[in-house]
Curated annotation (Swiss-Prot):
Protein's name according to its UniProt entry: Interleukin-18 receptor 1
Active site: E452
InterPro entries assigned to the protein according to its UniProt record, in alphabetical order: Ig-like_dom, Ig-like_dom_sf, Ig-like_fold, Ig_sub, IL-1_rcpt_fam, IL-1RAcP-like_ig, TIR_dom, Toll_tir_struct_dom_sf
Biological role: Within the IL18 receptor complex, responsible for the binding of the pro-inflammatory cytokine IL18, but not IL1A nor IL1B. Involved in IL18-mediated IFNG synthesis from T-helper 1 (Th1) cells. Contributes to IL18-induced cytokine production, either independently of SLC12A3, or as a complex with SLC12A3.
Sequence ranges assigned to domain TIR in this UniProt record: 370-516
Record localization: Membrane
Signal peptide stretch: 1-19
Quaternary data: Forms a ternary complex with IL18 and IL18RAP. Within this complex, IL18R1 is involved in ligand-binding and IL18RAP in signaling leading to NF-kappa-B and JNK activation. Interacts with SLC12A3 in peritoneal macrophages; this interaction is increased by IL18 treatment.
Keyword terms, alphabetized: Disulfide bond, Glycoprotein, Hydrolase, Immunoglobulin domain, Inflammatory response, Membrane, NAD, Receptor, Repeat, Signal, Transmembrane, Transmembrane helix
EC top class, as a word: hydrolase
Protein's gene: Il18r1
Annotated Ig-like C2-type domain residues: 33-102, 134-189, 212-312
Domain notes: The TIR domain mediates NAD(+) hydrolase (NADase) activity. Self-association of TIR domains is required for NADase activity.
């Protein structure tokens, strides 16, 4: 007797568990603002009180780190037996969840969908069902998961309430198509929540026989290119057991390069009717495939329909006049734009180089072992008629190049200790400099500066250890005697000083800095000097 009761109890448990079957889904979609719960399949509560089966829950973050959930994690998240409940679920709850009992681990990815304010349901949570016309349409609103908490239930069609009783049982009509939403009102801890389940009902034609028919024109020409692969696609409206096949009207139809793709027959339902498509494949089209009938046929014992395809050589069209004209116009405009860009680059070459030096922080002075960035050669004697030249060399140049741009100049009167051998000292200082700046004037060559000039020219033109920058304080055409070697200097290394070039943004100073070595030293600036380099210090 005890054995029979045990078998009966087991049968009841099997039937009960079957009625509440559990399917594990790794991806779950829910809508924000509704109650939801997670429960692993195949785990039940302990049979005896002395058994321990502690369920632990974890939530993953974007950095794949997991934190354990508890009663303090959120007032909306509760634990009941082996269930993780959300009252309700919100957007911030989206993520990966893991349950663990001993060595048993289950995981889910929870995707929370934002509620559509203009609809009573979310498109991502809609299930679909096809119903044949004049067959039973049965819709019942049930939610066994919250059965004990549901207080009210409503049934909507396309978001309009249609029935006081949440149930439909009738013969389906085409007008019954639509979105049916069951809305359950659930109360929990004094708060009311709504749960929505929506199904999309599509009413289709009955499975009565239709007359088989090929879709589209009865004859179709298809342009092809020799050597290319081609596919012909034929579609038909038919019944489930109708014949549907390709045939070739050709004496030798056993070409292995022409194959009917039997595995890729595609079927679908449209307006309640069954449709299918078949593909005929050609590998590397040749002349033999052209102007031949390839027939697609659908048939049953009552009717037959055929469509013919003919392959013809595709004509390569000439370039339309407007396309040719447009292409030429684009080409001309591109050429003009390129020329303009080149011209602008030539005109603004100095500005572009200085900009590049500034952003790249290039420094050409780090590894050459030299002490000075430039040796300034100028008229040493300050007579009233040469005062402007002298002031320019010993005051203006250092104030701009040293204070504004961070260069280190060698000024003879400032940096040379008196009493040494002048010629040897000058030669040594020029060797330690990266540039030789010559301030050329009418009196320059008649002065002792001639020694500096000869030494610098030797370094520049013979040993190629230094580059010369010539500043014409007096136009060279007004100088009676000019060494031939100076005439060998490239024109861009000859700068002409004008009294109207006080601003540091003037072309003279930009060209001078361009000819100086690139240096990444951040200059020390005085705002007053930035306005006018000729102002008194």
């Amino acid at each position: 007797m005890h054995h029979e009761e045990l078998i009966l109890t087991l049968c009841i448990l099997i039937v009960k568990s079957a009625s509440k079957s559990c399917i594990h889904r790794s991806q779950i979609h829910v809508v924000e603002g509704e109650p939801f719960y997670l429960k692993p399949c195949g785990i039940s509560a302990p049979v005896h009180r002395n058994e321990t089966a502690t369920m632990r829950w974890f939530k993953g973050s974007a950095s794949h780190e997991y934190r354990e959930l508890n009663n303090r994690s959120s007032p909306r998240v509760t634990f009941h037996d082996h269930t993780l409940e959300f009252w309700p679920v919100e957007m911030e709850d989206e993520g990966t969840y893991i349950s663990q009992v001993g060595n048993d681990r289950r995981n889910w990815t929870l995707n929370v969908t934002k509620r559509n304010k203009h609809s009573c349901f979310s498109d991502k949570l809609v299930t679909s069902r096809d119903v044949e016309v004049n067959k039973s349409l049965h819709i019942t609103c049930k939610n066994p998961n919250y059965e004990e908490l549901i207080q009210d239930t409503w049934l909507y069609k396309n978001c309009k309430e249609i029935s006081k009783t949440p149930r439909i049982l009738k013969d389906a009509e085409f007008g019954d198509e639509g979105y049916y939403s069951c809305v359950f009102s659930v109360h929990h801890n004094g708060t009311r929540y709504n749960i929505t389940k929506t199904v999309n009902i599509t009413v289709i034609e009955g499975r009565s026989k239709v007359t088989p028919a090929i879709l589209g024109p009865k004859c179709e020409k298809v342009g092809v290119e020799l050597g290319k692969d081609v596919e012909l696609n034929c579609s038909a409206s038919l019944n489930k057991d109708d014949l549907f096949y390709w045939s070739i009207r050709k004496e030798d139809s056993s070409d292995p390069n022409v194959q009917e793709d039997r595995k890729e027959t595609t079927t679908w339902i449209s307006e309640g009717k069954l449709h299918a498509s078949k593909i005929l494949r050609f590998q590397k089209i040749t002349e033999n495939y052209l102007n031949v009938l390839y027939n697609c046929t659908v048939a049953n014992e009552e009717a037959i329909d055929t469509k013919s395809f003919v392959l013809v050589r595709k004509e390569i069209p000439d370039i339309p006049g407007h396309v040719f004209t447009g292409g030429v116009t684009v080409l001309v405009l591109a050429s003009v734009a390129a020329v303009c860009i080149v011209i602008l680059c030539v005109i603004y070459k100095v500005d572009l180089v200085l900009f590049y030096r500034r952003i790249a922080e290039r420094d050409e002075t780090l590894t050459d072992g030299k002490t000075y960035d430039a040796f300034v050669s100028y008229l040493k004697e300050c007579h009233p008629e040469n005062k402007e030249e002298y002031t320019f060399a010993v005051e203006t140049l250092p104030r701009v190049l040293e204070k504004q741009f961070g260069y280190k100049l060698c000024i003879f009167e400032r940096d040379v200790v008196p009493g040494g051998a002048v010629v040897e000292e000058i030669h040594s200082l020029i060797e330690k400099s990266r540039r030789l700046i010559i301030v050329l004037s009418q009196s320059y060559l008649t002065n002792g500066a001639r020694r500096e000039l000869e030494s610098g020219l030797h370094e520049a033109l013979v040993e190629r250890k230094i580059k010369i920058i010539l500043i014409e304080f007096t136009p060279a055409s007004n100088i009676t005697f000019l060494p031939p070697s100076l005439k060998l200097l490239k024109s861009y290394r000859v700068l002409k000083w004008r009294a109207d070039s006080p601003s540091m943004n003037s072309r003279f100073w930009k060209n001078l800095v361009y000819l100086m070595p690139a240096k990444a030293v951040k200059p020390w600036r005085e705002e007053s000097e930035a306005r006018s380099v000729l102002s008194a210090p």
